[in-house]
A protein has these predicted regions:
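Short acidic (Asp/Glu) and glycine-rich catalytic loops that position anionic groups and cofactors
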Residues: 140-143, 233-237, 266-267
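Histidine- and/or cysteine-centered catalytic micro-motif in compact active-site loops
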Residues: 219, 242-246, 295, 303
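A short acidic/glycine-rich loop-to-helix N-cap element
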Residues: 248-252
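Short, surface-exposed loop or secondary-structure junction motifs
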Residues: 1-223, 227
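Short, well-ordered beta-strand elements
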Residues: 217, 228-245, 348-351
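Peripheral terminal and inter-domain segments
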Residues: 213, 255-375
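Residue-level recognition of short loop/turn positions
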Residues: 131, 234-235, 344
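A short acidic/small-residue loop/turn micro-motif
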Residues: 246-247, 355
Length: 375
């Protein structure tokens, strides 16, 4: 495996249960404080990479060989952030980000911390749903990953506009400071892996088309957070969307804003689907429950020779759109399904959206199911 495999989520790892900050600090007998923040502590960083690396090294089953298939993996970007910590010359990943990115760009309200934001009265209250009930708090440590490259940045609209403007300027800040080479920007945006037809993933950025224009961006979600940045290099504009509520369609909102500005149709238009049907063999082999170590799952069921995807949000028709390819039409876009098959033709997993889900095979329904399957 190489670094570029992790940069484009093709290391071959299934989604695994999240290793979180609060449980790790409890086991270590330490806590966050303004005097000694976790994001700068060497012992916490080393414990985090130890836990993640040991778990990844223990995996015996994979989505495919490195570089073969896209499957979003926060663990991979966590490992990347620790590589930066070890080899950048800085004591922590947080310090590197501050010195090399935030300060040169003038992003004075952005940081990777936890407690400082929870105590900040000018920080957003986070609205999240747990066990069917809404909660409102400033718990910026809630479900936070132990390695900060997996999604720890807290920012503002103004700061993120400075960040996305750097891409539009070819790697240069508003003040003229070079943050990244023009070649580096281009490498980040080049397509490396297919997410679904018409959508690819580069080095930390997703790429799609809006007519003849290119759209490049990325989203993020946590309890109480829905976010999206979106760039159109040809038009020289960018959209930043931040919301302090979970499960908001941030990507759809950002793209609608971009389309409106560029004079494109704003509303989502469902694609014209080919006239295909699932064969009896395909229906038999696809039916079953697919479960991710992150806790998400879906079930493919058959009714009257048609397939449906059942999730917590309801049941939707799984359209056949090609050889062993399926599509679910959602409110704001399509979710593509691509099964992973063995040499014998058996379905043992499926990429659904951005994740690859192992198919359950009569094993115990626990959080380690991804590591128990055989491919």
């Amino acid at each position: 495996m190489r670094i570029w495999h992790l940069l484009c989520h093709s290391g071959g790892f299934f989604p695994l249960p999240r290793l979180v900050v609060d449980k790790t600090t409890q086991k270590m007998g330490i806590s966050d404080s303004l005097q000694e923040e976790l994001v700068y502590r060497k012992d916490f960083a080393e414990q985090g990479i130890r836990l993640v690396a040991e778990r990844l090294a223990a995996q015996t089953e994979f989505t495919g060989a490195p570089g073969q298939q896209f499957s979003y993996c926060n663990d991979g970007f966590g490992v990347l952030s620790d590589i930066v910590r070890r080899y950048s010359g800085y004591d922590s990943f947080a310090e590197y980000v501050e010195q090399k990115i935030l300060q040169p760009l003038g992003m004075t309200r952005s940081n990777l911390g936890f407690l400082r934001n929870s105590l900040d009265e000018n920080a957003a209250i986070l609205y999240s749903k747990e066990s069917g009930l809404w909660r409102a708090d400033r718990n910026y440590e809630n479900d936070a990953f132990v390695l900060h490259g997996g999604g720890a940045m807290k920012s503002t609209l103004a700061d993120l506009m400075r960040y996305v403007s750097m891409y539009l300027r070819g790697g240069v800040s508003e003040g003229g400071t070079r943050i990244l080479s023009r070649a580096g920007i281009r490498e980040m945006m080049l397509p490396r892996q297919q997410v679904k037809p018409g959508v690819t993933y580069g080095y930390g950025l997703q790429r799609s088309q809006m007519g003849v224009r290119t759209l490049v961006g990325h989203g993020g979600s946590l309890p109480g957070v829905s976010s999206q940045i979106l760039l159109c290099p040809e038009a020289g504009i960018a959209v930043v969307f931040l919301c302090n509520t979970m499960d908001v369609p941030a990507a759809a909102a950002a793209e609608s804003c971009m389309r409106a500005w560029c004079g494109e149709p704003v509303r989502y238009k469902a694609p014209v689907l080919p006239e295909c049907a699932w064969s009896e063999e395909q229906r038999q082999k696809l039916v079953g429950t697919y479960a991710s170590g992150e806790g998400d799952h879906f079930t493919i069921i058959e009714e009257k020779q048609e397939l449906f995807v059942q999730t917590e949000g309801g049941k939707r028709l799984l359209h056949a759109v090609g050889d062993w390819k399926g599509l679910v039409q959602g409110t704001y876009g399509e979710i593509w399904l691509q099964p992973v098959r063995t040499d014998a033709g058996e379905v043992r997993a499926a990429q659904y959206g951005t994740r690859t889900f192992p198919k359950e095979s009569g094993i115990d329904n626990d959080m380690d199911r991804a590591a128990k399957l055989r491919f």
